[in-house]
Structures are given as structure tokens and as C-alpha cells.
Amino acid sequence: MADITQQMNNLSVEQGSQGNGSSRSQYVPPHLRNRPSGGNGSFGGNRRGGFNNNSFGGFDNNRRGGYNNNSFGGYNNNRRGGFNNARGSGRYNTPKPGVGRWVDGKHEPAEKNERLEKELYGIDEEPTTQSSGINFDNYDDIPVEASGEGVPEPITAFTAPPLDPLLVENVKLSRFTKPTPVQKYSVPIVAAGRDLMACAQTGSGKTGGFLFPVLSESYMNGPAEVPETAGAFSSHKVYPTALVMAPTRELVSQIFDEAKKFAYRSWVRPSVVYGGADIGGQIRNLERGCDLLVATPGRLKDLLERGRVSLASIKYLVLDEADRMLDMGFEPQIRHIVQECDMPGVEDRQTLMFSATFPKEIQFLARDFLKEYIFLSVGRVGSTSENITQKILYVEDEEKKSVLLDLLSANDNGLTIIFTETKRMADNLADFLYDQGFPATAIHGDRSQYEREKALAAFKTGTAPILVATAVAARGLDIPNVSHIVNYDLPSDIDDYVHRIGRTGRAGNIGIATAFFNRNNKNIVKGLVDLLTEANQEIPDFLNKIARESAFGGKSMRGGSSRGGRGGATRDFRKQGGSYGGGASSSNWGGSSSSGGGWGSSNNGGYSGYSGRSNGSSSYGNPSASNSWW
């Protein structure tokens, strides 16, 4: 890593290209399969047909609607229906490899299966396996602020109790050695029956922060009862106990993959649904078993309207990357799912919201969906990790390709993600790198789900160690061993920059982030300088000069506060004098806050309406100190 940094420090725009394509493996990305090879690779096949082999984790090249990743551990059982047989003995009575049962109020874990364990957890030293990084212990020094009444004491290790013994075993198999700060607090908070709104820096273990406690409590308490009012067609409908909503197909697939690891040998069967893939195949997968459902809002709304999913048994609702979902316009679907369908009300479920940033608008949303929640802020939320070495290079647009080749030639190890602003540039840049002998692939919104999954599989396994991506991969994706991020095109929003470079330096590992900056990026210069200062990074002279020029011009160059400014993204809104029905005390935990009254006219432009469920039940935002099902 020191060698890479040294070579980067010596870079200049005048240096020539050092492609050295002859020394690299000849890989042909999916979108170039129809091009004549020209001596640059031996792979053939159809341009849009994916890889001509079946080596990528069981992907089926003959399916255009995405691979069958709902079959737990790769097993494709043919179980149909029968979801209502959980009311007494034996939920999912037919034993399956790696799948336990809930029988007569007791959890019966399945026997261990070596083949499944190898498939789920991989082998040490494999490129797809990431262990705790060398700086993981530094997380112990990250400040944590928890506000709310009666915050439970954090845990210090993965032990049983408070966690279920089976979950502890699965966590060890996944090579997690100690909880991150967000996990230390989320486990006891969920165990205490409390709602949670958590902010944590990118790469700090937010996925485990909700999967660990939700699965652990599910193992100990069992599935929810299916409503007795289920109709004649209920055998075709699934009744999950937990629902996780996230904004993108890639993120829900990633959460599902993690859920499979931690649900191994348990009664809980994870499933995933998302748009862009064959809905018929997803329905068939749901019918094989669904206790924990991971979904994008649009596809879930579709399945609810088709009568294939019921939320009547939901105990746990998780909203991951909530700010991103609002940015993408999912708020109407989310409100419909939570407030207008058959999901239990706010008093009868536990709700957890996780994200790297929580501006005021998201905290407003929390007043409808959460009750007497605990607000958890871990580290510099909305900032960058000091595990990431940030380098800002001044590069004019016409010189970017040459400088990029120098960077890639200097960094022969690890995985590299290159971010562009447009889909066309992503394709063009991937083609250019391929022609220069660099095995690259690309993902963006115009690629089919099948092509995106193939590209990510090739990237994760190191077959194509360079991924050119638009913002579709910027949020939430947790790809092991990404050592270098290149912002070929800087975003116009500084928060997008934060999330992009957060793809490296994850779980305590060290990474490098390089950005190509020129005067076309003046709109984010102030925010960029602030971020570099916060993370104790070197600020180049040209950046300070342009920042001073921008400030002298009298214009705000904050660049990145699309949701009302980053300053409010780390603080509990209840402590800022918002329109809650009560103030917060000055105790260490921020005091308690009464959230009564729903939305009022003093919301400063906040949402109006949506104060209650359409079926006439009590309005959201009215707190209760108890959970009826705990």
C-alpha cells in the first residue's frame, strides 16, 4: 500500500501511459463479447449473453431474468405453498439441508453441512472473502452518541446471551471477530424491544447492525402467527416475520446474501425480490419459503397488489439507506406499504432505520414510522473514514484517460472501482480500458439485471478486477477487498462523493481514493476541503486556491447538501427544538422526547397529511413505552 501511495505522489499529467497490457490476463467483459478479439482475449460468445461458462457461483446463463438466488445455499427444493401450517407444530416440516425448524415452540437447528458452509462462507485467503481489517480495533475509539430514554448498555463481544447461540456460531463462521460500534448498540436496543434510528459511517457494519439482532430475536421467539382471517387463497401467499426495504437491486441482493450466512441452520428462510427480474420466478421462490423478506419498494408493492405477500405477521421492519430511497422517489411506495397495507401499526412492530446520513427530512419521516426511538450516531456520520487515503489530482478532461492508465499501472493488486457520471462514459471507458489490456467491466442502469449480476460476479472474483460504474453502485454495496476508488468524474453532490469512496476502507481495512478535479468541479470545492480537513487528509494547494476564489466570489460552494445541509445529518432532531410535543432534557443521553401530535403546521416545510393509517387505526408518531408482543 505504501508503494502505491508513493507512486501516486510522483504522478504528473505529463507522464505517459504505461498500460503494459501484455502482462495482464485477457478478459472480455460481457458487453464486448461480439467484438472481434483482435488478439486481445480468447473469450467469445454473445454480446449480451453473459459469460460462456458456469463458474460464477452457480449462475445460470440460460436465464434472462436474473439468477435463482432465492434457493437457500444453492438448493432448489420444490416446496409449494403450505405457509399456514406454522400455527401449531412444525413450520416447514420437510427437512432441507441447512434449514432448521420451529417445532412446538422450540427452535431445532439443522445439522451442519460442509458443502453449504463452503458455499456460504468461502475459504480463507479467497478474493471473495474479507476478514476484519488491520485497523478494526480503531473502531473502539470512535465516539458514539445515543439519545433517547433508557438506552441499554452496549455489548462488547458476540456472546450468548444476549445473542442466540446459533447466530453466534454463524457470526464466527463469517469471520467476524468483534462487533462494530453500531452493532454493539443495536443488539441490546432491539433485544429491549426499542425502535432505532441509526447513523454510522460507511463500511461500519450497518447490515450486521440490523441482521444480527433481528435474526437472534427471531431464533429465540419463533415465527409470528399467521392471521386466522387468512382467506381461501392464503396458501399462495407468504407471511414473512421480518421485512427489509432498500433502494437498489444490488443492495437488496447483497443483504440477502448476508442473511443467508447468518440464517444458516435456522428456521428462518430469507428471500429477495426486486425489479428488473422475472416476477414469476420470484413468486415461485417465495412459495418455497419466506420468513425474512428483502425487497425494493416498487417490486414489493407489485407483489402486495397481486396478493402474493401479506405483511400482517411483520414483527420487524427495517429501512436501509432510507435517505437514498427518498432521493430516488420511493417515499409514496414506502408510505403505501407501511401505512396503507396490512402491516401491523407502529405500536405492534419494531422499526429500525439505518443509513450513512439522516438529514432532517428523514428524521421527519421517522416520526410517522417509529415510536420512542433511540437515535444512534456513530463516528463522523456523513463524513469519510480515516482508513481511506484521499488523493485529489488536478486533471483536465482531455487528460483523464492518460492519467487513469498511469494510476492503474501503478496499482496491480486488489480491486478498483472507477466512477463516471454518465452511462455512456461508463461504457466508453470500459471499452477503452479493455483495448489497453486492462480487464474491465461496467455496470449502470441500462444494463439488464442479468448483465449487472454477471459483471459484479466477475469483479468480486477478480476475473475483471476493474469495475466502471455510475451511481448505481455508489451506495450500499459491500464488495470485499476493494483497494482503490477512482472518481473519474466527480459528482455534483458531496454526499455522493462520500458514499462513492466508502466502497473502500471497509470493516477497518485500508484503501485509497483518487479524484480527478478541475475547475468544472468548483461547485463541490468547499465541501471537499471540509471533508479532507475532517479526515486529516492532505489538501493540495490548487484546491485551497480554488476554494478561496469561490469564497471570495460570494457564492456558497457547499455542494452536497441536497437535503438541507450536512450539519443536521448527525444529530437527533428531537434535540434541535423541532415540532415534537416536548423538549429534550440536557442529560448525557439527550433526555426523552414525546413525539405526540403527529404533523403540525410548524414543520418548516415538512410533510403534511399521512398522519394515520387509511384503515382508521391510530396515527403514527404517538409514542408508547411498551411493545405488545414482547
From Swiss-Prot:
Low complexity bias: where?
Answer: 15-26, 78-91, 601-630
| Coarse class of the protein's main subcellular location | cytoplasm
> Example GO biological process term?
cytoplasmic translational initiation
Locate the Helicase C-terminal domain: which residues? 387-547
Q: Name one Pfam family in it.
A: Helicase_C
Tell me which SMART domains the record gives.
DEXDc, HELICc
Query: Which InterPro entries does this chain map to?
Result: DEAD/DEAH_box_helicase_dom (IPR011545), Ded1/Dbp1_DEADc (IPR044763), Helicase_ATP-bd (IPR014001), Helicase_C-like (IPR001650), P-loop_NTPase (IPR027417), RNA-helicase_DEAD-box_CS (IPR000629), RNA_helicase_DEAD_Q_motif (IPR014014)
Note whether Cell membrane occurs among the keywords. Answer: no
Q: What class of enzyme is it?
A: hydrolase
Q: Which domain of life is it from?
A: Eukaryota
**Positions of region (Disordered):** 1-49, 78-111, 554-630
Motif DEAD box: which residue numbers? 320-323
Q: Which GO terms describe its molecular function?
A: ATP binding; ATP hydrolysis activity; eukaryotic initiation factor 4G binding; G-quadruplex DNA binding; G-quadruplex RNA binding; mRNA binding; RNA helicase activity; RNA strand annealing activity
**Where does this protein have compositionally biased stretches of type Polar residues?**
1-14
Task: Return the motif ranges for Q motif.
Answer: 156-184
Is Ribonucleoprotein one of the keywords UniProt gives this record? no
Q: Which parts of the sequence belong to the Helicase ATP-binding domain?
A: 187-376
Alphabetized UniProt keyword annotations = ATP-binding, Cytoplasm, Helicase, Hydrolase, Initiation factor, Nucleotide-binding, Protein biosynthesis, RNA-binding
Its Enzyme Commission number(s) read 3.6.4.13
| Function statement | ATP-binding RNA helicase involved in translation initiation. Remodels RNA in response to ADP and ATP concentrations by facilitating disruption, but also formation of RNA duplexes.
Q: Which family is this protein grouped under? A: Belongs to the DEAD box helicase family. DDX3/DED1 subfamily.
What is the protein name stated in its UniProt record? ATP-dependent RNA helicase DED1
